[in-house]
């Protein structure tokens, strides 16, 4: 009866003793000697080959057999031989991946480890980002299982790996070492520019420097994240700089011409040009994220939500945020962004409307009507309802508590800094199917 072994790629092959003898002979020759028939027979006799055994297990047995027979130098050379072949196989795997990626119809089908990555174009930049992903996956899994074993024991660490490999759970962004996502306050940027995060830009002083600096700041922060970067204060800060140039009542005369150039731009046109600059720039691919755009989230607030979170907020010069002008700016941005999406595919920002509820209804009727109006016009955004403005929601983050652990500057900056290290997803479909097939209640399982 023929004995079959399992190769590294999972394929079955008929067992050949000659291949083992050949590898052992090479190890002896590398040690400056050779194996006699008696020596070879003694080593082979220690092997226990059975149907379905893996190549790795056979090679492990050969190492043990060589040391048991006293051929320690030969065993060492055999291990080196295995290591070099492993490296050769990894190199060949990389070369195969390179060719397959180049021949793939698109970036998703060409990606071996991360087909869900937000990559639209297939080019050298995306290819460079794909190459090290298998190494990152191994490193991330090793770090996490080591920590689980240290905190809860080896049994749970092994269970985690089993659930992962059997696809009961999915660990997001194992192909990156960076944290998953973060909601940030931009207050340090107002004080020190980008110096706190390794940049050299000075704080913004006007509307133009705010827009340009904001883009750079978001790109810098996002380069250190594998997921989203949320800026809940974006429109509030923009409103502050607009007010510094045109007065806090600028929205009352938005059609006023304020541009001395031939274009004769109005205040409204200046503002929408700023929208265009920021949104289109952030939707561009970036080398720091393997030719992906950043994942950017923003928030809108009704009056009560805004006052609850930013009521005591003060800008560095001591000025309070002006709600009336911000109210106009929020609505103007939503209207502009919804219309702009008819002209171009703009994924970001991902928007969340935060509404305070009372007795089962939205407290701010003006924003309840406006939210419904935007949905009726076909706009796509999240709506977060809460009866207590103690939390924020951004995109997939259902609820971020900010009352107890929120970031707060002594000048009164709102507590909007939060985020997550990583995200773990339960594969409910797989879980239910497995439980049913095993005759178990999927609810209990």
Language model region names:
Residues 87, 94-445:
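Conserved catalytic cores of very large enzyme subunits
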Residues 1-107:
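Charged, amphipathic alpha-helical regulatory modules used
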């Amino acid at each position: 009866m023929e004995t079959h072994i399992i190769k590294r790629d999972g394929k079955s092959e008929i067992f050949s003793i000659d291949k083992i003898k050949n590898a052992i002979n090479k190890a002896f020759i590398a040690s400056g000697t050779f194996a006699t028939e008696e020596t070879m027979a003694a080593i082979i006799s220690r092997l226990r080959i059975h149907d379905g055994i893996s190549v790795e297990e056979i090679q492990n047995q050969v190492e043990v057999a060589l040391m048991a027979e006293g051929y320690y130098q030969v065993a060492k050379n055999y291990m080196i031989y295995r290591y070099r072949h492993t490296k050769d196989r990894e190199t060949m795997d990389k070369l195969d991946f390179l060719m397959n990626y180049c021949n793939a119809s698109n970036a998703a089908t060409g990606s071996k480890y991360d087909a869900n990555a937000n990559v639209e174009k297939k080019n050298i930049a995306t290819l460079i980002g794909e190459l090290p992903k298998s190494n990152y996956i191994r490193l991330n899994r090793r770090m996490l299982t080591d920590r689980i074993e240290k905190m809860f024991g080896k049994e749970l660490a092994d269970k985690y790996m089993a659930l992962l490999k059997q696809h009961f759970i999915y660990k997001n962004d194992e192909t990156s070492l960076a944290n998953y996502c973060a909601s940030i306050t931009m207050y340090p940027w107002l004080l020190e520019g980008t110096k706190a995060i390794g940049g050299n830009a000075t704080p913004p002083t006007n509307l133009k420097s705010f827009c340009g600096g904001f883009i750079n700041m978001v790109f810098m922060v996002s380069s250190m994240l594998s997921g989203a970067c949320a800026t809940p204060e974006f429109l509030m800060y923009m409103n502050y700089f607009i007010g510094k140039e045109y007065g806090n009542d600028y929205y009352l005369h938005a059609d006023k011409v304020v541009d001395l150039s031939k274009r004769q731009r109005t205040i409204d046109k200046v503002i929408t040009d700023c929208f265009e600059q920021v949104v289109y720039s952030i939707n561009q691919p970036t080398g720091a994220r393997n030719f992906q755009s950043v994942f950017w989230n923003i928030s809108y607030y009704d009056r009560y939500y805004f006052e609850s979170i930013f009521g005591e907020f003060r800008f560095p010069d001591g000025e309070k945020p002006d709600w009336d002008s911000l109210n106009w700016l929020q609505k103007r941005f939503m209207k502009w962004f919804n219309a702009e999406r008819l002209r171009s595919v703009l994924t970001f920002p991902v928007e969340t409307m935060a509404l305070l509820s009372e007795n089962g209804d939205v407290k701010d009727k003006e924003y309840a009507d406006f939210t419904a109006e935007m949905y009726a016009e076909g706009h796509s955004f999240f709506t977060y309802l809460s009866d207590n403005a103690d939390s924020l929601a951004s995109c997939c983050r259902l609820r971020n508590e900010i009352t107890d652990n929120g970031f707060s500057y002594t000048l009164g900056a709102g507590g909007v800094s939060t985020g997550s290290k990583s995200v773990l997803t339960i594969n409910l479909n797989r879980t239910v199917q497995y439980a049913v097939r095993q005759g178990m209640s999927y609810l209990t399982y």
